[in-house]
């Protein structure tokens, strides 16, 4: 069965929700005025590859390693080219050249790219979830204003081991989370004395999106315990309920390790994590045990929290469940937590 380039209206809504969540993470970062990190940006633009054209978007966190170097994390979405709906995460090492009294910066970055792709199935189902590795190479020109804001123009090139390579041109708006003494990028981020996190318990509700041709959704929830195990490292144990609709009927337990940064006198924290997800119960359309029942899958997540006081916090989390049986999901949830 041919795999169409265009998606159903429901899948376009799901894609819009993912983009809105990316904007929400950017909003959390931009709210962090006297922060302890460096730059956060949201990009959007056009992409070509695989015999077609589409959109592309990304959000990017970058931290200085000195005047001429930086490290960055990006969540990169390659849109909907023919037979492929691909996105993923990349960690890049950047070289940068400040010009014109640091107001204009030219930089180039490269790093591993872990991608997740919904593709046409060779047999059976109309789709399959393909995962793989590649490289993300980027060239960027950035202009720094006098008020922490920066405008960026960036070209990306993906080279993957299986699937089409793509090229995108994107425009981005960024914000410096750690205010520099003069316009331009900071050389390094400020340090901290103690751990970002002590102990937290958070209950969340939200939406589960099955990564298929139609992207059906279901209401889900979770209960998370989070503990700081090092200055910038958290560990979580989570019961994850993905929903009860026929298309998405799965629940399980996840264990993850997170890299975490705190801003605005520790009121806001951003983190990225990865780990394992054990399916306790999965049912198919007829209510019988599903293919994933009792299996271990991967899970990768990003999360943002706002701490109201010493005890209470709000959290939003985007989980990507990565399976080996074509049941990948995006689980996007928000809720209230307690610190102790």
Regions found by a protein language model. Give the residues of each.
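Bacterial N-terminal signal peptides that target proteins for export
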Residues: 3-22
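Short glycine/proline- and aromatic-enriched beta-strand/turn motifs that initiate or cap beta-hairpins
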Residues: 35-81, 95, 103, 166-229, ...
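Repeated loop/turn-to-beta-strand initiation elements of outer-membrane beta-barrel proteins
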Residues: 39-40, 67-73, 101-106, 143-153, ...
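Transmembrane beta-strands of outer-membrane beta-barrel proteins
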Residues: 39-45, 72-76, 107-113, 152-156, ...
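Extracellular loop and loop/strand-boundary signature of outer-membrane beta-barrel proteins
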Residues: 46, 78-81, 123-127, 157-159, ...
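Residues that define the transmembrane beta-barrel architecture of outer-membrane proteins
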Residues: 53-57, 85-91, 131-137, 165-169, ...
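Residue-level signature of outer-membrane beta-barrel architecture
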Residues: 63, 95-99, 143, 157, ...
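Gram-negative (and chloroplast) outer-membrane scaffold detector with strong preference
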Residues: 65-122, 222-287
């Amino acid at each position: 069965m041919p795999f169409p380039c265009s998606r159903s209206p429901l899948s376009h809504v799901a894609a819009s929700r993912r983009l809105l969540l990316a904007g929400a993470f950017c909003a959390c970062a931009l709210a962090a005025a006297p922060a302890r990190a460096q730059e956060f940006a949201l990009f959007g633009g056009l992409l070509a590859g695989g015999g077609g054209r589409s959109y592309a978007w990304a959000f990017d966190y970058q931290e200085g390693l000195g005047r001429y170097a930086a490290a960055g994390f990006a969540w990169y979405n390659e849109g909907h080219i023919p037979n492929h709906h691909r996105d993923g995460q990349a960690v890049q090492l950047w070289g940068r050249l400040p010009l014109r009294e640091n107001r204009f910066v030219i930089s180039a970055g490269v790093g591993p790219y872990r991608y997740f792709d919904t593709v046409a199935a060779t047999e059976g189902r109309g789709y399959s979830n393909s995962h793989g590795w590649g490289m993300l190479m980027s060239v960027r020109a950035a202009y720094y204003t006098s008020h922490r804001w920066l405008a960026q123009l960036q070209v990306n090139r993906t080279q993957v081991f299986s699937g089409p390579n793509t090229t995108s041109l994107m425009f981005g708006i960024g914000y410096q989370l750690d205010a520099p003494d003069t316009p331009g990028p900071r050389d390094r981020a400020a340090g901290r004395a103690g751990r970002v996190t002590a102990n937290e318990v958070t209950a969340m509700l939200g939406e589960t999106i099955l990564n298929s041709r139609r992207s059906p959704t279901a209401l889900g929830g979770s209960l998370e315990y989070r503990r700081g195990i090092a200055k910038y490292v958290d560990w979580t144990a989570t019961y994850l309920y993905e929903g009860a609709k026929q298309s998405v009927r799965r629940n399980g337990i996840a264990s993850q390790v997170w890299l975490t940064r705190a801003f605005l006198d520790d009121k806001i924290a951003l983190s990225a994590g990865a780990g394992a997800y054990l399916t306790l119960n999965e049912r198919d359309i007829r209510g019988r045990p599903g293919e994933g029942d009792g299996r271990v899958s991967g899970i990768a997540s990003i999360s943002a929290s706002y701490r109201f006081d010493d005890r209470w916090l709000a959290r939003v989390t985007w989980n990507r469940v990565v399976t080996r049986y074509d049941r990948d999901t995006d689980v996007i949830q928000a809720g209230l937590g307690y610190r102790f």
